[in-house]
């Protein structure tokens, strides 16, 4: 957990990945810092302070989801993104709103489990190596030293059998020590061994996914799994691959699942972030039965956001201190079209601005994961170094902005389409090109994109 970041530090970290949108960054930075402040309070006061949920308003592709996702990743908090349109009112077929909390707890369990695995990794690898030694130098089957039933009664011929067993054990121990040394030196990595691994069974309850009955299916499956034996199967693998599988198995045995569950539920309750996208799609004045159903979804979401207890396979989870970040474009509706009770549960409103040509230029080159850096790295694997002139980057940004204006505005996602079209031929022929360095010029951009961008009808289908 990295809750110690100051709001300014959080904004600086977000700047590494997201261009612009200062208001949204400030809002999430303050929300995160308030969690740290709350953790320092006395318990009686801490229970009274709930997080202030955020409503982000802005067109698609301007960074709403990315701001929330990077925020959660920054502090290592459990985070899930859900779409409001996927939920249905209680009583209808579909996912119920409580499933978002169950998904959050599952994410939290995975995060805590991964952390625990890292802690026991060394011990698990040591035990896996021990198992590999036993597989490579197996113990001989112990045979009874008595050939005649009467010998068992009178103790005959036992001494000679014990002596030979002791000698055999000594030889095996020497062999195992030799194999241990070779394993440690990495000399047996390509040796093939036969190991028994637990078989991953596909569940018949998978068909319940997305029907709103998945929780019932999981509970029933867990109940069956507790008394059904686990299936194992033999696999032939190299020592290197076998070590990975055995280390994972040993790590799972070393982890205390009760401790994992307890910590995961705590993190989900106190640090969890749920991002509800497309919330504008369930807003609207009552005019027909569809709108009534949308309002039903809003009313179902309300108690979750207000604070309630949700039953999960890991126990009851309180939603009082989960941070909810809702987002929507609100093209066809307004935030005031949400039911008043739900509006009141999102006190912080942030409007994200449309992206300009200058923003597109920055998106192409400035972030740590900038698009141009990605394409340069991909083509470098073929031995080709590509570079973009400043004028070419400006040209790409102008075309992306223009196509957004002429067709649907999909924000920064337009750059992915533009870049793919621009480098399509180069990516196709990269393995056959003998040139080591290629410079992308404004003329090249013009040649590949301008004719399509100028023709509105064509750009609707291609860009």
Curated annotation (Swiss-Prot):
Keyword Disulfide bond: no
A Gene Ontology cellular-component term: HslUV protease complex
Region Disordered, residue ranges: 154-174
CDD domains: RecA-like_HslU
Oligomeric form and interacting partners: A double ring-shaped homohexamer of HslV is capped on each side by a ring-shaped HslU homohexamer. The assembly of the HslU/HslV complex is dependent on binding of ATP.
UniProt binding sites for ATP: 19, 61-66, 277, 341, 413
Gene that this sequence comes from: hslU
One of the record's GO molecular function terms: ATP hydrolysis activity
Domain of life: Bacteria
Keyword flag Cell membrane: no
UniProt-recorded name of the protein: ATP-dependent protease ATPase subunit HslU
Assigned keywords, A-Z: ATP-binding, Chaperone, Cytoplasm, Nucleotide-binding
Family of the protein in this entry: Belongs to the ClpX chaperone family. HslU subfamily.
Alphabetized Pfam families for the sequence: AAA, AAA_2, ClpB_D2-small
Free-text function comment from the UniProt entry: ATPase subunit of a proteasome-like degradation complex; this subunit has chaperone activity. The binding of ATP and its subsequent hydrolysis by HslU are essential for unfolding of protein substrates subsequently hydrolyzed by HslV. HslU recognizes the N-terminal part of its protein substrates and unfolds these before they are guided to HslV for hydrolysis.
Main location: cytoplasm
PANTHER family the record matches: ATP-DEPENDENT CLP PROTEASE ATP-BINDING SUBUNIT CLPX-LIKE, MITOCHONDRIAL-RELATED, ATP-DEPENDENT PROTEASE ATPASE SUBUNIT HSLU
SUPFAM superfamilies the record matches: P-loop containing nucleoside triphosphate hydrolases (SSF52540)
UniProt subcellular location: Cytoplasm
A single BP term in Gene Ontology: protein unfolding
